[in-house]
């Protein structure tokens, strides 16, 4: 049953297969075929008055449809307003508004629909694009490709919209036997029955007044028996059909219809009431052409199915099957498609879900878009109301500069004897070092790759108030000043003014939070009694801004455990520090309950010439900033380090160790071998095994290690 409203979206001034309500004001009417569900309002008084008051409104249809319509006296008033258009012949039509005189020309082409005699499809072409209205149609697969008027040259015309017959647009009706297959099955049944005797009669139980003429003609031609029908009026001008039908009831094939219902003549199954003249009873079988019944079957059936003692069902369809609809639409490939009929038990949403993937508009909207991922450095904050067209990643922002979070306080100039080598300092307390992560831009060999999911950014503020959480890795380009360190260790600032810039332990290592309660401090052994792991790192050029790579990010870091260690009570922690091209190398130590011994060695000029400004970590010994305090003094103070010895660049510094966590001490036991390989410094010599054994043995015993350098290397 058609549910088409009668108006095309592209050409609303036309009315097709619907002639009531707003359609009455249309400038032209079109009728695809003479079935009642497509003729609503066609003989209504309102439309009749509209025709009487208009001189230009016409009804366009095929010649067969015109003959079928005018054979019914109820539509006789249309005789002067019907224009028959030749099938497959493009025709120019002028649409004139009788009120304003506005005129629009469109081209319409009638294409065979294969639904019933006279049924056509309308192809409209005009300023608003090409539109195809199928009405009811039955086209076999590949038949659309054979229609020349659907093509422009060798390609299919650019069709904007298709108003489609979707009666069987349901997977249940995926395949419907073709008319030839149905005809073959019916023909065999009728032949086998009628040849038994002249009293064996077949009744074709057809529900429509017309539409089965294809079946009648072929049965008559094959068997030589005319088909009995109720009326011949509608076919009087169609001799090709009229020759195969008759009103004579004494024939073996009947297609007559009951006036009201199937029980019109009880005891006789023929609606016409024919009986044998000599009293011999007739043997009648009924064949009901149907499609819906076969679609409801679960199992595959034959074209002809026996449903009773003398009743049969024959699969015979006037509408395209599901697969035929898909074939037609995939070949036409319109921009839009609109269903004219809803399948039994279906909905418009389900039908559109099936049809839309075959439309070009759907393909354009769902075509995958390949976009570059962009910079994967951090999550981009976006408004939640952004549409789906937004990119997943921010490709417009440049790399975020690595700057310290707190720069409110200006760094104080270093009050040392060498102001030309002084660096800018960041005045931060130890708690600030624990709670915050400061970022700085690196100038050498820095792999800047942060992958963030907004968790790190959100946790920055929370870390300021929660000392129990782990701190993020710190990469600092500046050194903390002496005043800040002195205040953290309880030493007055006036005692520290003579000290040079002091690098903080947190500048090089990730700090793990330690509970500073007195209870924990009592449980920790002093660093003087405890043995620790060694850490090797190198400083960059003292003239330029220092650049560092944190131990957790550096690929050159490794862990070295002490050889011959005797446990906690045997030795002190030793840290080996290497400085490149630094002019001042003096040390002062501040302890808080314990001490460590640190060895600082100065690289030779040959080593400083290498373009390696990264820190080489030879052991990871995380601690808080308040645990390690170092002062760098002038080079002249080196000479007073040891009496009777040559000037050295390797010194021992005691480093406070008051808050080592048990977890960190337990980890040292497992560091029995190097975890990574340390790349050699350019132009450096590989130390011999016996020298390394001797060096480690002295380090394990807590003894000072001095390296004599030749005068030319100073």
Swiss-Prot record:
PANTHER family: DNA CROSS-LINK REPAIR PROTEIN PSO2/SNM1-RELATED, PROTEIN ARTEMIS. The gene is DCLRE1C. Residues 447-468 have a biased composition (Acidic residues). It comes from Gallus gallus. Its main location: nucleus. It is found in: Nucleus. InterPro entries: DRMBL, Metallo-B-lactamas, RibonucZ/Hydroxyglut_hydro. GO terms for biological process: adaptive immune response; DNA recombination; double-strand break repair via nonhomologous end joining; interstrand cross-link repair; telomere maintenance. Belongs to the DNA repair metallo-beta-lactamase (DRMBL) family. This is Protein artemis. The keyword Hydrolase applies. The modification Phosphoserine is found at residue 670. Its EC number is 3.1.-.-. It is an enzyme of class 3 (hydrolase).
